[in-house]
Amino acid sequence: MEQFRNIGIIGRLGSSQVLDTVRRLKRFLLDRHLHVILEDTIAEVLPGHGLQTSSRKMLGEVCDMVIVVGGDGSLLGAARALAKHNIPVLGINRGSLGFLTDIRPDELEIKVAEVLDGHYLVENRFLLQAEVRRHAEAIGQGDALNDVVLHPGKSTRMIEFELYIDGQFVCSQKADGLIVATPTGSTAYALSAGGPIMHPKLDAIVIVPMYPHTLSGRPIVVDGNSELKIVVSKDMQIYPQVSCDGQNHFTCAPGDTITVSKKAQKLRLIHPLDHNYYEVCRTKLGWGSKLGGGGD
């Protein structure tokens, strides 16, 4: 197992609970004589921290591991910035759900110590890359760990588009939009739209129509190496948007083409050894527990 000596910390802004957890994490890491580097944005709200600071972009170059304190949204943003550096990322949950940031604050010292001592699991989660092209020229591009979503933006009108997979025409559709999700993102927006849950180890992409104006529109799961092309109808009166993880947005025009494919670099997501994906689903999604045993 890798030895982690230079630890970066990213924290969600605007939360006193996050700041308290970052301070606690900092003290714990320093007590273990590790080199701690704060992302510059969180460092600005921690006066007197006395630590090295770095931009998020540079953290991937100077750290052995990055710990994200926040919710899944915080980890999504960190993942897009750090995946290209092949650096392990660990999440401490200070959000509402915690599918990706799976260490509870009350077990911080115990679980982080286990990871630092080499007792951990690594999952390689792939990302999607999206590009919007207009008249054969790229006008926007972004990455997503969860999903790439075509949606009407502020408009309430439906979008008309054509879908192609690996150059083959699949369908034309009129809908509120289209969600293209990774296995990681299958428990996010895609799940709310009626998509299936996919295990993170699957090499697959799920395509989920949003409120299609048809009785036969259903999600479809395709090979993870597929290249998707979405062509926005030239006859539309609105300018839809493409969103990557709900955080980066691009405005499309009628006739634009959106391509979505797997990104070469993957996120190295660290979990404690007792991590159980099905337990996470059961806890976060409210699945039923085991039937209670009993006597006669």
Curated annotation (Swiss-Prot):
Pfam families: NAD_kinase, NAD_kinase_C. GO terms for molecular function: ATP binding; metal ion binding; NAD binding; NAD+ kinase activity. One of its GO terms (cellular component) is cytoplasm. It comes from the Bacteria. The keyword NADP applies. It is found in: Cytoplasm. Keywords: ATP-binding, Cytoplasm, Kinase, NAD, NADP, Nucleotide-binding, Transferase. Its cofactor is a divalent metal cation. GO terms for biological process: NAD metabolic process; NADP biosynthetic process. It catalyses: NAD(+) + ATP = ADP + NADP(+) + H(+). The active site is at D72. It is an enzyme of class 2 (transferase). Signal peptide: none annotated. NAD(+) binds at D72, G73, N146, D147, R157, K174, D176, T187, A188, Y189, A190, L191, S192, Q247. Belongs to the NAD kinase family. PANTHER family: NAD KINASE (PTHR20275:SF0). This is NAD kinase. It comes from Pseudomonas fluorescens (strain Pf0-1). The lineage of its organism: Bacteria, Pseudomonadati, Pseudomonadota, Gammaproteobacteria, Pseudomonadales. The gene is nadK.
